C-alpha cells in the first residue's frame, strides 16, 4: 500500500539530552527518552520492551504515560517477546483516530512492524525506530540465570545492564536482590563473548547504516576520538535518519537535545557494518550448558582468568588501560 514515507540518504547526528538528570538516568545519551517524551506529551502511544520481574522476560507493551515509559528505559541483553503487540498496536490506532505511535525495537522487530504497518495501511501513522544491536541470547538463558541468582540471593526487584556511576564508557551491570546489589558481570561477559547469541544474529541483515526504519539509535562509541569537542562522559547517542519521517521526527526533538551533525565515518562501529561474528566456543558453550547447567557455564565463560586480573591490576597501578570485559 502506498505511503508518504520516503527513503533518504542516511543523515547522522550525535546527540544527548540537555536535562542532566534525565541524561544521567539514561543508558546512553537519552535518545529514547527524548523520542518517547515527544509522543507521550501529545497523547500519542509508544511501543517498547519492558522487563517483567515475575517471569524474567522482556515483553513489548503499549506505553501511554511517563511512569510506564520509565520501565522501558535501559539496555536489555536478552531477546524481547513480541506477544500480540502488533495486533494491539493496530487496534489502538483504529480506536484513536488522528493519533500517532512510536515503535522502538531491534532491527528485526522494527522491520517486522514496518512491514505489518504497510500491509495494514497504518504506516503513515507510525514512526519506527530501531536500536543498534549486538545480538540476542536465548531468553531461556537469562531466565535460568535470574532464577539461579534468586535461589542464592533472594527475589530480584531491580535490573540494569548499564548503570553510569563510573561514567558512560564503564557501565556497571547489577541486579538488586533483597535490597542488595549483586553483580551480573559474568552474564555480560558471556553476552560479549558471542557464544550465547541466537543463530540468526550471526547472519543479521540489519547490521548496516542503510535501513528502512525511520531512524536508528544507539551509543555513539568512540566519539571522544572522532568528535572530541562534543564528547560527554555521561553519555552520547547516535541518530541515523533514514526517511523523510525520521528527519521530521528529529526536528521535533531537537529543542531537548545538544546535537551535532556527523557522518558514517565518524560513527563507525562493527554492528553498523556486519553482524556479530560467531564465537569459536559457541558449540562448546551450548554443549556445556545442556550437560552441566547455567552456573557451570557462567563460571567457565563469564569469569576473568586470574592471569588477566593480575595484568589489569598492574596496568591500573602503572596508570595504563584496564581490560573491562
Please place each PLM-identified region on the residue numbering:
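Short, flexible loop segments at boundaries between secondary-structure elements
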Residues: 124-148
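Iron-sulfur-cluster electron-transfer modules
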Residues: 1-105, 252-325
Amino acid at each position: 500500500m502506498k505511503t508518504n514515507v520516503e527513503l533518504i540518504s542516511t543523515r547522522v547526528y550525535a546527540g544527548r539530552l540537555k536535562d542532566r538528570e534525565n541524561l544521567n538516568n539514561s543508558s546512553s545519551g537519552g535518545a529514547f527518552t527524548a523520542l518517547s517524551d515527544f509522543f507521550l506529551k501529545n497523547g500519542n502511544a509508544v511501543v517498547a520492551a519492558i522487563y517483567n520481574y515475575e517471569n524474567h522476560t522482556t515483553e513489548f507493551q503499549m506505553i501511554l504515560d511517563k511512569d510506564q515509559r520509565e520501565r522501558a528505559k535501559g539496555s536489555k541483553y536478552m531477546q524481547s517477546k513480541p506477544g500480540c503487540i502488533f495486533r494491539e498496536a493496530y487496534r489502538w490506532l483504529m480506536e484513536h483516530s488522528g493519533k500517532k505511535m512510536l515503535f522502538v525495537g531491534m532491527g528485526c522487530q522494527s522491520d517486522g512492524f514496518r512491514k505489518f504497518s504497510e500491509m495494514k495501511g497504518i504506516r503513515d501513522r507510525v514512526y519506527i525506530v530501531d536500536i543498534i544491536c549486538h545480538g540476542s541470547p536465548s531468553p531461556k538463558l537469562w531466565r535460568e540465570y535470574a532464577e539461579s541468582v534468586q535461589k542464592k540471593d533472594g527475589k530480584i526487584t531491580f535490573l540494569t545492564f548499564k548503570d553510569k556511576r563510573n561514567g558512560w564508557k564503564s557501565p556497571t551491570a547489577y541486579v538488586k536482590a533483597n535490597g542488595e546489589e549483586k553483580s551480573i558481570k559474568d552474564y555480560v561477559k558471556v553476552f560479549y563473548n558471542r557464544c550465547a547469541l541466537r543463530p540468526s544474529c550471526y547472519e543479521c541483515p540489519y547490521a548496516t547504516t542503510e535501513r528502512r526504519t525511520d531512524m536508528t539509535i544507539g551509543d555513539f562509541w568512540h566519539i571522544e576520538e572522532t568528535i572530541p569537542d562534543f564528547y560527554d562522559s555521561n553519555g552520547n547517542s547516535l541518530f541515523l535518519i533514514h526517511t523523510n519521517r525520521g528527519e521530521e521526527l528529529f526536528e521535533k526533538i531537537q529543542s531537548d537535545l545538544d546535537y551535532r551533525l556527523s557522518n558514517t565515518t565518524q560513527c563507525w562501529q562493527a554492528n553498523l557494518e556486519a553482524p556479530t561474528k560467531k564465537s569459536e566456543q559457541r558449540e562448546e558453550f551450548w554443549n556445556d550448558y545442556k550437560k552441566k547447567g547455567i552456573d557451570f557455564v557462567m563460571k567457565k565463560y563469564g569469569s576473568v582468568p586470574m592471569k588477566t586480573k593480575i595484568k589489569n591490576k598492574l596496568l591500573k597501578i602503572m596508570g595504563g588501560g584496564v581490560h573491562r570485559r
